[in-house]
């Protein structure tokens, strides 16, 4: 008799919701189907878009006989790390000029978050202090909870962010949570285009947030996944991070180049570290190097080369910013068109929040029954939270989606 597998007691994990949604969409034979769940840019033909500047740089790399496939340094491609941190902080950043900034190339934004979380769990607020509270917004990108718990943090809390009644930022709730958090707590902040709500604090509100965080000795860990992709303006989307640096904060900023370069499967990320003096950066990076060594050891080169080539060449950089604006403008257009159609249909409720939000996602305010109706009856795939990816909308499906939302809201109040 054969003995049972040693893995017989391993339970089946639940699928990752957003990827299951895409799998269900692909298997659906209905010709009307629309995927509003995918977290990637799509053209008006609902196709992935390789940025023209990326195509150009890929060709340059392919034709460069001096490049090879040797290991990159553990911390990554130096030119990429430098360019990425400069993009986040700005060319005129005093922190850069004073050499108190460091970067770690990572496997996407998730990898940057994980390296930062692993470092903080070992060296922040006391050695190996896994009890430091980590605050994530309510709601947030679901991976934030998993990354910090996976790094060993035992006390992950939520802070007020979304006001469902007014469909906007709950600033007072946010500030109250900052005031009541234990000193030295870690706060995960969305640099721009908050996921999933698409609602960001204004500069004045960010100043209030920073003021309380400074007084309470709270540590800002920014997640910057959409720089340039949110408003179409790189500097505007980096405003919050740069303001915190100007206020003297030490901070981490996890950067992703998946969205603004369209390099989803290249996994290009960077963890920017800002400290108070250069010596601290050297020591922090030395410890991060040890963490990277036992995580992925050395990062991949292709995506980092594409980003570094583009950001370091004035002509390519200008072309890239144009490509980014093309994507941002299409999203803004879809927001305006969807709102206009819902208001023309006199769909119950208010829909101004759709155009007031920014970035790839809109937190529609649709309830679970309305979402269930859209998925099961109308073949429009979106998350149970009501979050939709504006890139899934096109001039061809806008009328169908708007009419379907109108039906869902009318049937299920």
Swiss-Prot record:
GO terms for biological process: aspartate biosynthetic process; glycerol biosynthetic process. The modification N6-(pyridoxal phosphate)lysine is found at residue 259. It is found in: Cytoplasm. Gene3D superfamilies: Aspartate Aminotransferase, domain 1, Type I PLP-dependent aspartate aminotransferase-like (Major domain). Its EC number is 2.6.1.1, 2.6.1.3. PROSITE patterns: AA_TRANSFER_CLASS_1. The modification N-acetylthreonine is found at residue 2. The keyword Transferase applies. L-aspartate binds at residues 39, 141, 195, 387. The modification Phosphoserine is found at residue 149. NCBIfam families: PRK09257.1. Homodimer. This is Aspartate aminotransferase, cytoplasmic. It comes from Equus caballus (Horse). The gene is GOT1.
